[in-house]
């Protein structure tokens, strides 16, 4: 792990993310940057500051996810942001929350499947554009949905 990146991860402690989670997040970030050379997953200009721009930004919503939830849905998951980052964090916490990652792009879906298998995450890729279908609101984490809808 690059020392400068390790220091950046310490910001996650304010979000109650344990230090033991940092290596897995850094490994995901490294795999993301590597795959980004072949498949456009994130903007090239954001690669240099990807710890802040992608990992820490994704982790910032962990407090709005109810720990008792059974399912968390990431619509338009793309590079797995925030879904994969959250799945890694919740796995390290010992949580059983399942993450459904909806992504319409075959290339991005294949990347997500590789990541899920690599980290043995409680997650599944649904390769479809869920935004064009009616969302089954009963399946959504109601606490998260309600907090998001009242904040915007």
Where are these regions (language model features)?
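Class I SAM-dependent transferase core
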Residues: 2-69, 107, 111-121
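Conserved SAM/SAH cofactor-binding pocket of Class I
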Residues: 59-152
């Amino acid at each position: 792990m690059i020392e400068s990146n390790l220091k950046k991860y310490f910001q996650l402690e304010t979000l109650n993310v344990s230090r033991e989670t940092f290596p897995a997040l850094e490994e995901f970030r490294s795999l993301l940057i590597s795959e980004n050379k072949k498949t456009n997953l994130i903007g090239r200009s954001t690669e240099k500051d990807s710890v802040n721009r992608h990992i820490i930004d994704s982790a910032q919503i962990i407090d709005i996810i109810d720990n008792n939830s059974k399912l968390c849905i990431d619509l338009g998951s793309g590079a797995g942001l925030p879904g994969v980052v959250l799945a890694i964090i919740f796995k390290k916490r010992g949580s059983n929350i399942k993450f459904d990652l909806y992504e319409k792009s075959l290339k991005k879906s294949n990347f997500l499947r590789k990541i899920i298998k690599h980290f043995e995450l409680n997650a599944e890729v649904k390769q479809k554009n869920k935004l064009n279908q009616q969302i089954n609101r009963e399946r959504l984490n109601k606490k998260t949905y309600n907090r998001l809808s009242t904040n915007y």
